[in-house]
């Protein structure tokens, strides 16, 4: 394995750069978007306007770009890196690449917020790094780091990355080429997000996992690999990644810019890494789910203290302290950026107050920590620096929580609060709490949602018209869509991009064939993307612009979701819940049906179809059931996925009309991954 020399990236002032158009898209199924005769509107990607250039220049006045502390931290401990890193999947598409980000080796262009550009440059520093004696990280092989802690007979792995098929295996291969072979004695998965568990099958095989029926100490002594996770982990994995998996994956395209080209006018970084990996996800059920809020154990000679932090960045999450190394692993509770209290891909909102409290609790529990490291970005060293890092991070979440509630009690709505609130000046200037991933505006709305829900108490909003109907009514009242477009174009020339995007998107929802509205909306969104400091916001704006111009016709064909490795880890009850979600109630609402479900590898259930609603009862088989079917647990997923071959192979109708069973199978919905978002 060749080693490249560490490249110290210099982050300097903005340099005007020649702008090139985004990669030309393939033919799309969306309405063709052509230039407006009089307005000059067209479907091409645009350079930054002067308003955008000025907005990005103002960032230099806000932040101290001469402060290279984070750059030094990102480089510290570097040991080795490959000359090239470019992992390709089906049809030659990049699954993970650092090579494509070579364009970052210069000053920020007009089309990028210079603060986000710096973050992207630091995330382009990749390879093997030493955190402290005996603790190493492979960074930049995935959006998340894979951490290796040396034990007496091998390695403890902290988090696994996203992809078993691609990134995790490559990271392990690279690590072993530098550090030698060694058995993985334990895997600690810090929380229930796919970029932390999805690579596990690239590190270990299912047959290597310790006996789940054994206590943890016996698992660790067995010679097998223990998989240690926080309380509630398995339930959180399934509910978040399977129940709304289709919608979440579609929205993730916007958050992570998965379909955008790499480049100055495309995707840069999402703050916690360059981008997400969405292929080759694996899942192995944990062997030990922690119960105690704080507990200590010894893993192959390494003392570890676990601190559970539920409801923070994930419903199930935990920090880990290695007292002999004075090294504090903060999972994703600290990440070198302002994180999401609500993630744009969609998930349960997080508890800002609890998040801050668990960080300060970690400070109290582990006051001797001399290095803090985590699942994303780079460590921070030195006892005082560690304390300051934790304090500033906790203070940001606590401020957002407390100030939002103050304004709520003064009668303001979430949208109003988001436009009012601003971080204290000293916190605003801290590089590692900048808004690279989460933002102050959408985090405020998350706090509002947690305490007050969606309703702002204005009864006008109790039963609003759906967007297309509202848009058509509004356009009818306005009377002349052409005149609206003229005014919007004039406002675009004034740099009022948010308003232009809003009003033109209303025109699109009233008439998706309005080509000029699509073009102008895309142009406005593109400028908002160029100005965004949050990588997630930049991606969302640019993907929306892309789809308005091109549709989704050239996106890769979507496989049926919800039947992958993660879904197969569900227990029978959770699978039945998922069946109820996938079942199209309208097709069965006139039917009442009872089914004995005899599972060969789990408890039996009585299923009741009541006006199209699926209810189930454990260990309650009925002699009067309309159907009796037997199958292994995985057969439930054969039904939900509509896989006729597996249905025939796995499922036996023991009693009743097989045609009735087929009716049940035919009621399962087939989700379209590429459902519309920016248009009706």
What are these regions (language model features)?
Residues 471-503:
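Alpha-helical segment of the N-proximal tetratricopeptide repeat
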Residues 40-52, 337, 353-416, 420-455, ...:
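Divalent-metal (often Zn2+) His-rich catalytic cores of metallo-beta-lactamase-fold enzymes
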Residues 121-182, 318-322, 326-332:
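Conserved beta-strand hairpin/beta-sheet module of binuclear metal-dependent hydrolase folds
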Residues 130, 155, 160-164, 222, 233-309, 354-366, ...:
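Metallo-beta-lactamase
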Residues 153-154, 165-228, 508:
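Active-site metal-binding motif and surrounding structural segment of the metallo-beta-lactamase
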Residues 26-39, 490, 496-502, 506-509, ...:
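Feature captures hydrophobic
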Residues 18-21:
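C-terminal motif of bacterial Sec signal peptides marking the signal peptidase cleavage site
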């Amino acid at each position: 394995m060749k080693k490249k020399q560490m490249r110290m990236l210099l982050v300097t002032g903005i340099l005007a750069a020649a702008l090139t158009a985004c990669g030309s898209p393939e033919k799309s199924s969306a309405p063709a978007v052509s230039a407006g005769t009089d307005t000059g509107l067209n479907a091409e990607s645009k350079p930054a306007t002067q308003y955008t250039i000025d907005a990005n220049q103002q960032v230099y006045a806000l932040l101290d770009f001469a402060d290279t502390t984070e750059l030094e931290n990102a480089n510290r401990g570097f040991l080795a890196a490959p000359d090239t890193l470019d992992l390709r999947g089906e049809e030659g598409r990049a699954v993970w690449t650092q090579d494509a980000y070579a364009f970052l080796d210069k000053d920020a262009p007009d089309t990028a917020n210079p603060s986000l550009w710096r973050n992207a440059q630091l995330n382009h520093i990749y390879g093997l790094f030493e955190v402290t004696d005996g603790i190493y990280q492979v960074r930049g092989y995935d959006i998340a780091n894979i951490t290796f802690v040396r034990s007496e007979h091998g390695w403890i792995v902290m988090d696994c990355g996203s992809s078993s098929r691609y990134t995790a295996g490559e990271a392990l291969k690279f690590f072993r080429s530098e550090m030698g072979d060694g058995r993985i004695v334990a895997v600690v998965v810090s929380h229930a997000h796919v970029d932390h568990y999805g690579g596990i099958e690239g590190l270990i095989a299912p047959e290597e996992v310790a006996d789940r029926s054994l206590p943890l100490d016996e698992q660790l002594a067995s010679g097998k690999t223990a998989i240690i996770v926080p309380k509630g982990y398995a339930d959180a994995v399934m509910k978040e990644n399977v129940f709304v998996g289709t919608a979440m994956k579609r929205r993730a395209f916007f958050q992570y810019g998965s379909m955008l080209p790499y480049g100055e006018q495309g995707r840069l970084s999402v703050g916690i890494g360059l981008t997400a990996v969405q292929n080759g996800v694996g899942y192995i059920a944990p062997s030990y789910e922690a119960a105690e809020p704080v507990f200590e154990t010894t893993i192959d000679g390494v003392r570890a203290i676990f601190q559970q932090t539920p409801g923070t960045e994930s419903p199930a999450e935990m920090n880990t302290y290695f007292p002999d190394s004075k090294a504090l692993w903060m999972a994703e509770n600290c990440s070198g950026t302002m994180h999401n209290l609500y993630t744009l891909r969609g998930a349960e909102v997080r508890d800002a107050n609890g998040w801050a409290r668990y960080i300060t609790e970690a400070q109290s529990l582990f006051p001797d920590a001399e290095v803090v490291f985590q699942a994303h970005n780079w460590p921070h060293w030195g006892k005082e620096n560690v304390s300051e890092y934790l304090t500033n991070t906790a203070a940001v979440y606590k401020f957002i929580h407390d100030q939002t509630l103050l304004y709520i009690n003064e009668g303001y709505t979430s949208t109003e609060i988001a436009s009012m609130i601003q971080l204290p000046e000293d916190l605003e200037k801290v590089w590692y709490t900048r808004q690279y991933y989460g933002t102050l505006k959408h985090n405020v709305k998350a706090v509002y949602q947690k305490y007050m829900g969606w309703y702002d108490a204005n009864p006008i909003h109790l039963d609003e018209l759906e967007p297309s109907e509202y848009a058509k009514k509004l356009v009818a009242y306005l009377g002349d869509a052409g005149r609206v477009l003229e005014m919007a174009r004039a406002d675009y020339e004034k740099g009022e991009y948010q308003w232009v995007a809003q009003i033109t998107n209303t025109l699109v929802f009233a008439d998706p064939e309005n080509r000029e509205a699509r073009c102008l909306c895309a142009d406005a969104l593109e400028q908002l993307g160029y100005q965004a400091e949050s990588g997630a916001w930049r991606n969302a704006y640019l993907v929306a612009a892309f789809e308005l111009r091109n549709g989704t016709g050239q996106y890769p064909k979507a496989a049926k979701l919800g039947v992958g490795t993660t879904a197969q880890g569900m227990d029978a009850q959770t699978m039945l819940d998922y069946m109820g979600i996938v079942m199209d109630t309208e097709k069965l609402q006139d039917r009442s049906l009872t089914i004995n479900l005899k599972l060969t590898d789990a408890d039996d259930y009585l299923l009741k179809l009541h006006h199209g609603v699926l209810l189930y009862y454990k260990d309650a088989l009925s002699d009067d059931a309309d159907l009796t079917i037997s199958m292994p647990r995985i057969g439930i997923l054969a039904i939900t996925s509509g896989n006729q071959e597996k249905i025939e192979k796995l499922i036996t109708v023991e009693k009743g009309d097989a045609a009735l069973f087929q009716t049940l199978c035919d009621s399962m919905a087939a989700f379209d991954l590429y459902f519309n978002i920016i248009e009706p």
